[in-house]
Amino acid sequence: MIITTKGDILKSNAQAIVNPVNTVGVMGKGLALQIRESFPNVYNIYRNACKLGKVQIGKMFVVSTGLTSHPEYIINFPTKKHWKEKSKLWYIQQGLDDLVEVIQQRNIHSVALPAIGCGLGRLDWNVVYEVIDMKLSNLPDSVVVFVYEPYFGREGKKRPSILQQYSQPHKMNWR
């Protein structure tokens, strides 16, 4: 079951929080920095794994927080190879496939998922959300995925989805 929400993902009661990361071991901005500051042990494990080449695009790098309360896991989700790069939709698609496997293998019943790749990664939220919905909607109803929508500024406006934008021929931009 997918539930969209807003707010501070670190205050989520979900069993696992997804953390968008790169594969070079830097958690310098955004949610990754907040995770680094809140869970220094998770950061150290992730950084060392990056040095060993164990954090790869398309594969979740799961770290136990060691907490008896939530979150039990931080699921590091590589959305870009280097922190200087933009995210690629292909990376999100591959990663979501692996996230489904991780959720099932670890019997995770609730996940807090940010707008992966849409902040510093600069992907379009409407497109990414459609991919999230497509990839995660087949999870059992006993699994709850809290999808945290991005903040778009004071107006809080979202652009129409890609499907809506291009549903009529006269709206297509062929440049």
Regions found by a protein language model. Give the residues of each.
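Macrodomain-like recognition of ADP-ribose-binding/processing modules
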Residues: 1-175
